[in-house]
């Protein structure tokens, strides 16, 4: 995996396999690990299970650019796994992709670049923590989207929330108590689609 100082691209892939098909999905995940490890541009990846629905999974990835992500879409084994998932194993999925605008770890803020205009619904905050974060910690500035815990580490949580607007996102990112989280990241979502509504998906030649 490579590291870049450029603005990062976040990908959130939420998937619900058909009943009895979870292991098929996880088998494909294992087969793709060696490909991902050697693929240029992947900065970070972790997988989670929904806290209140153990059939729903999340793959959260950080890429160094849209170009690198596009190259991964064209990987042969990735395309085979994707086709099998869509045709046989997935009941539904949702993909959200966007540029990371800000990242806060402990008391340090980095990668801040708010000189953009975004629709309220196009912003997404991911909050990584070592435990469940109560709704009261963010309800003034955002609404809860979903909560996941680590697939291989039950003490790794990620909470996805939708800020009311950019000002609320700024306030939450800068003021949440550092006792509650390990990292907060703000993304401007440019593509958001599900299995049956792919208006914002790449063309058939460039599936995600």
Give residue spans per PLM region:
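Short S/T/G/P-rich N-terminal loop/turn motif that feeds into the first structured element of a domain
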Residues: 1-56, 67-73, 89-208
């Amino acid at each position: 995996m490579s590291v870049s100082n450029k603005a990062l691209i976040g990908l959130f892939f939420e998937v619900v396999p058909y009943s009895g098909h979870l292991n098929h999905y996880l088998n494909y995940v294992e087969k793709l690990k060696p490909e991902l490890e050697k693929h240029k541009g992947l900065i970070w990846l972790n997988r989670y299970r929904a806290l209140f629905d153990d059939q729903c999974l999340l793959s959260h990835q950080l890429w160094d650019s849209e170009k690198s992500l596009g190259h991964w879409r064209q990987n042969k084994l990735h395309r085979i796994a994707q086709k099998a998932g869509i045709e046989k194993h997935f009941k539904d999925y949702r993909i959200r992709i966007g540029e990371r605008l800000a990242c806060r770890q402990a008391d340090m803020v980095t990668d801040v670049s708010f000189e953009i205009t975004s629709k309220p619904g196009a912003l997404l905050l991911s909050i990584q923590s070592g435990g469940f974060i109560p709704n009261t910690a963010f309800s003034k500035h955002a609404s809860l989207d979903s909560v996941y815990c680590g697939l291989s580490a039950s003490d790794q949580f990620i909470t996805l929330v939708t800020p009311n607007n950019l000002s609320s996102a700024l306030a939450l990112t800068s003021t949440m108590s550092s006792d509650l989280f390990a990292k907060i990241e703000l993304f401007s979502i440019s593509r958001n689609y599900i299995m049956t509504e792919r208006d914002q998906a790449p063309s058939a030649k460039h599936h995600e």
